[in-house]
Amino acid sequence: MAFRKFLPLFDRVLVERLMAETVTKGGIMLPEKSQGKVLQATVVAVGPGSMNQKGEVQPMSVKVGEKVLLPQYGGTKVVLEDKDYFLFRDADILGKYVD
């Protein structure tokens, strides 16, 4: 809950990456090198949005609690109470998962 003390500004989105799977469905343990980079995350905080040329606030495309797909590279690492979070621009998020 450390992210509750951090409020992203403008069109920034704070996410917590999901853990990589360490065991296959068949029960085989995967070494770290073969796990791959985690590209899925849960949104934990969003900024109010960015301003357009008319001075109106553009609404964010994601909400807190949604699962999103991240780009392979990018984002700013933020450490809050010994836990890693990542800060992305709203436009950098590739998509969101729908239940």
From Swiss-Prot:
Its main location: mitochondrion. Transmembrane segments: none annotated. Pfam families: Cpn10. It is found in: Mitochondrion matrix. Keywords: Chaperone, Mitochondrion. SMART domains: Cpn10 (SM00883). GO terms for molecular function: ATP binding; metal ion binding; protein folding chaperone; protein-folding chaperone binding; unfolded protein binding. One of its GO terms (cellular component) is mitochondrial matrix. InterPro entries: Chaperonin_GroES, Chaperonin_GroES_sf, Chaprnonin_Cpn10_CS, GroES-like_sf. PANTHER family: 10 KDA HEAT SHOCK PROTEIN, 10 KDA HEAT SHOCK PROTEIN, MITOCHONDRIAL. HAMAP family: CH10 (MF_00580). Homoheptamer arranged in a ring structure. 2 heptameric Hsp10 rings interact with a Hsp60 tetradecamer in the structure of a back-to-back double heptameric ring to form the symmetrical football complex. Belongs to the GroES chaperonin family. Co-chaperonin implicated in mitochondrial protein import and macromolecular assembly. Together with Hsp60, facilitates the correct folding of imported proteins. May also prevent misfolding and promote the refolding and proper assembly of unfolded polypeptides generated under stress conditions in the mitochondrial matrix. The functional units of these chaperonins consist of heptameric rings of the large subunit Hsp60, which function as a back-to-back double ring. This is 10 kDa heat shock protein, mitochondrial.
